[in-house]
Swiss-Prot record:
Record keywords, A-Z: Cell membrane, Cobalamin biosynthesis, Magnesium, Membrane, Transferase, Transmembrane, Transmembrane helix
Main location: membrane
GO biological process: cobalamin biosynthetic process
Cell compartments where the protein resides: Cell membrane
Annotated family: Belongs to the CobS family.
Membrane topology label: Multi-pass membrane protein
Pathway info: Cofactor biosynthesis; adenosylcobalamin biosynthesis; adenosylcobalamin from cob(II)yrinate a,c-diamide: step 7/7
Taxonomic source organism: Carboxydothermus hydrogenoformans (strain ATCC BAA-161 / DSM 6008 / Z-2901)
Protein name (Swiss-Prot/TrEMBL): Adenosylcobinamide-GDP ribazoletransferase
GO MF terms, alphabetically ordered: adenosylcobinamide-GDP ribazoletransferase activity; cobalamin 5'-phosphate synthase activity
Transmembrane parts of this sequence: 33-53, 57-77, 107-127, 136-156, 174-194, 196-216, 234-254
Cofactor (UniProt): Mg(2+)
């Protein structure tokens, strides 16, 4: 299990692992069961930085740090999937052509435009928070977006033969329960630590999982299934949904 965790950590994040790992495809393909734990690590790093130095700089500065930190710690892995997915979806081509576009390394104008709007909305959400709320939100966002990733892998058919095929073939009901448990424990723990309403965090968690499922179901219609790029894209969109949800739920005074 430790080897599986570390192999996944080197793939899903840029966090260095000491020593040399003996690669095992079988163990690597099981790594998504630790997706929420990887989110705890990356989100924890960013939250700790903000907690330690949050009072030294204004909130709009930390909003930029959060976005840059998320991109760096993930190696832009999910962003690449988001851009490829948007290019394919908004190409208005048939299913086979869309799948070809997913494999194209070039980025189209639609993807660039949508990604610009994505960054503005994400930045605006985080910039609206105090440093303490920023630290809390980036922590739960990193956990939840990866937790929903396993839900999507498990719930929808895979199309193609790229890297994500191994993740899909090894997804199981036990793995789904395990990742749900991690996500629930980690987010509730974060809420308790930051003195955030447990009811609110449960609402956000439920809405985020529902959001990821609905997006995945819609994208499945475009591609006849999902690919590894789609997995990353859906996780990125969920990573935007969470801070927006925190902002809206706090402002409208839900519970």
């Amino acid at each position: 299990m430790l080897t599986t965790f570390l192999l996944g950590l080197t793939f899903f994040t840029r966090i260095p692992v000491p020593g040399k790992l003996n690669f095992s495809e079988e163990k690597f393909n099981r790594a998504p069961i630790f997706l929420p734990a990887y989110g705890l690590v990356t989100g924890g790093i960013l939250a700790l930085i903000i907690e330690l130095f949050g009072r030294s700089f204004p909130g709009f500065f930390w909003a930029g740090v959060i976005i840059a930190g998320q991109i760096y710690l993930s190696g832009a892995l999910h962003i690449d999937g988001l851009l490829d997915s948007l290019d394919a979806i908004y190409s208005n081509r048939d299913r086979e052509k869309r799948l070809e576009i997913l494999k194209d390394s070039r980025v189209g104008s639609m993807a660039v435009a949508f990604f610009g709007a994505f960054l503005i909305l994400k930045y605006g959400s985080y910039a609206s928070f105090t440093p303490k709320v920023q630290a809390f939100t980036v922590l739960i966002s990193e956990i939840i977006l990866r937790g929903t990733g396993y839900l999507v892998i498990y719930s929808f058919p895979y199309v193609g033969s790229s890297l994500g095929r191994g993740f899909k073939d090894n997804a199981s009901t036990a793995g789904l329960i395990f990742t749900l448990g991690q996500t629930l424990i980690f987010t509730l723990g974060a809420a308790a630590f930051f003195n955030f309403s447990l009811i609110k965090i449960l609402i956000i968690l439920l809405l985020a999982y529902l959001f990821a499922f609905v997006v995945a179901a819609r994208w499945q219609q475009f591609f006849g299934g999902l690919t590894g790029d789609n997995y990353g894209g859906i996780m990125e969109l969920t990573g935007l949904f969470v801070p927006v949800a925190v902002l809206l739920i706090n402002n409208i005074g839900v519970v």
